[in-house]
């Protein structure tokens, strides 16, 4: 399907540079949009770094171009899942009465609608070792020699140890099922308890070992604290549960390093609200995280669509070496689709 690009919604990143959001597709049941880093999904303030008010303005302009009397009903467009403010990539905006069906599909309650979301993350590993050597240094690797259905759905008992579980000895594919501990602000059921909340979470992943990149001299010169003595590994991630900050949390727990330019995540996670401009990073020129919502597929009995979402304009530098213009290189695209 040929993407439909509309003129920009505007947003402001940490350095107050205007951003562009492209609408990838307008379907009768949903929209697919490409959110740059720095745009906030929740909130209804009429600020340029809040998603929905800008989306309403853009859609009204689009539909009014063909029908000057068109009246946009904001209640017909619902964000059914979210990306962290400094994560980029594809978002589904449900239209009309479809929002509940999408939300149910994320928890496997809707058998008539199937939605898959895959992400690409960048994991910086010390260049003195390979990723596999880095993993072995933990001394506690678990390899589950079972088929995928079994190892994803095996019943948990009180003796099951949660953590990082690889599918086989190649240390390429696996799951992360650490519990996630969060502030009560992240759990609507426990808003006012003042206690930390623990809940289960499950993440599938595939490390693309052969596609790792050594930062260029120019990258190291510009941002030495981010790139020096590092090798960057791309990793494909698919969520089986949808907890807040789940990918960022699971990467740190499983691999003992944060995603690229997410070095302050552990501090941010335990703060109710921060007015600090450098909330994620002090080593790069923005708060952008090396995490991108790169693939969405939506299927129902009457249709089946899939989307590979490019890196938004202005967010490419962090992904240097993994892109062909602003799209992922072919080998990564192929892995995204087939994983």
From Swiss-Prot:
GO terms for cellular component: mitochondrion. GO terms for molecular function: 21S rRNA pseudouridine(2819) synthase activity; RNA binding. InterPro entries: PsdUridine_synth_cat_dom_sf, PsdUridine_synth_RluA-like_CS, PsdUridine_synth_RsuA/RluA, RluA_PseudoU_synthase. The active site is at residue 84. PANTHER family: 21S RRNA PSEUDOURIDINE(2819) SYNTHASE (PTHR21600:SF81), MITOCHONDRIAL RNA PSEUDOURIDINE SYNTHASE (PTHR21600). This is 21S rRNA pseudouridine(2819) synthase. It catalyses: uridine(2819) in 21S rRNA = pseudouridine(2819) in 21S rRNA. It is found in: Mitochondrion. Pseudouridylate synthase responsible for the pseudouridine-2819 formation in mitochondrial 21S rRNA. May modulate the efficiency or the fidelity of the mitochondrial translation machinery. The keyword rRNA processing applies. It comes from the Eukaryota. The keyword Transport does not apply. The gene is PUS5.
């Amino acid at each position: 399907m040929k993407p439909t690009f509309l003129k920009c919604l505007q947003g402001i990143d940490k350095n107050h540079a205007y951003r562009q959001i492209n609408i990838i597709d307008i379907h009768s049941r949903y929209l697919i949009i490409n959110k740059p880093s720095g745009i906030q999904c929740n909130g209804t303030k009429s600020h340029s770094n809040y998603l929905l008010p800008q989306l309403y303005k853009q859609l009204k302009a689009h539909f009014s171009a063909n029908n000057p009397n068109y009246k946009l009903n904001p209640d017909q467009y619902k964000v059914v899942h979210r990306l962290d403010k400094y994560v980029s990539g594809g978002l589904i905006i449900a239209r009309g009465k479809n929002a509940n069906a999408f939300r149910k599909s994320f928890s496997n309650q809707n058998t008539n609608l199937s939605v898959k979301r895959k992400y690409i993350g960048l994991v910086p590993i010390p260049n003195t070792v390979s990723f596999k050597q880095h993993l072995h240094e933990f001394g506690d690797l678990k390899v589950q020699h079972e088929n995928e259905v079994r190892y994803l759905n095996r019943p948990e008992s009180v003796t099951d140890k949660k953590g990082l579980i690889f599918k086989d000895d190649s240390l390429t594919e696996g799951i992360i099922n650490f519990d996630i501990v969060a502030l009560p602000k992240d759990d609507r059921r426990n808003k006012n308890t003042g206690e930390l909340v623990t809940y289960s979470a499950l993440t599938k992943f595939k490390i693309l070992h052969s596609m790792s990149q050594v930062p260029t001299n120019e990258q190291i010169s510009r941002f030495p604290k981010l790139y020096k003595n590092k090798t960057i590994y791309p990793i494909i991630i698919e969520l089986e549960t949808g907890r807040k900050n789940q990918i960022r949390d699971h990467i740190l727990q499983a691999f003992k390093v944060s995603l690229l330019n997410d070095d302050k995540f552990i501090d941010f996670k335990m703060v109710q609200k921060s007015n600090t401009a450098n909330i994620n990073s002090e080593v790069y020129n923005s708060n952008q995280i090396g995490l991108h919502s790169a693939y969405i597929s939506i299927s129902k009995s009457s249709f089946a669509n899939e989307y590979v979402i490019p890196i938004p304009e202005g967010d490419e530098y962090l992904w240097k070496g993994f892109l062909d213009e602003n799209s992922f290189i072919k080998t990564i695209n192929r892995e995204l689709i087939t994983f």
